[in-house]
């Protein structure tokens, strides 16, 4: 009995010693796989399989010029004695619309369509001859300010700049939302995943900003009305 117990204890000691002297293994997480160039290419090809139309290309190309004018208007705010609230709004517009221009330019380039520069000018459809069915006449995008309106805004300072900026940007944003409505009202257009999300975001964001600017304009006009002469 005692010899049997001693045998069991001896075996247990040997096992413990083996565990204590064994090399310590540290669990390591497997490194994340790096996508191969071919996998990236396949993913990009998959993203291009969504159908797109002439109306989609026109929308993205036209919105680049449309956004560009809003950026020019917003960049005048710091140099034209704008109200702090207008300065904050202008900064948000610049940041958001510069990013969106990049998205639109990449979308067009990925589909081998002409990529307009970010210039606030009348949208010249003649620069979009790469896709059949384009109307080649120069045209003004909805809501864009005329040369006379832009000159008046650039000449204004202080409260006059605030008023012209807000009224002009409300007009500008309403034009952008009308472009979205036209896109979604065109048969077959707006089905591409990127365009659908982008256009939907433009509609929501700019509709929200229109309401904000209308409140700001009302508050500025009220403040001016009660201010002593």
What do these predicted ranges mean?
Residues 10-21:
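Bacterial N-terminal signal peptides
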Residues 25-229:
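All-alpha RGS (Regulator of G-protein Signaling) helical domain and cognate RGS-like helical scaffolds
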Residues 2-12:
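Bacterial N-terminal signal peptides that target proteins for export
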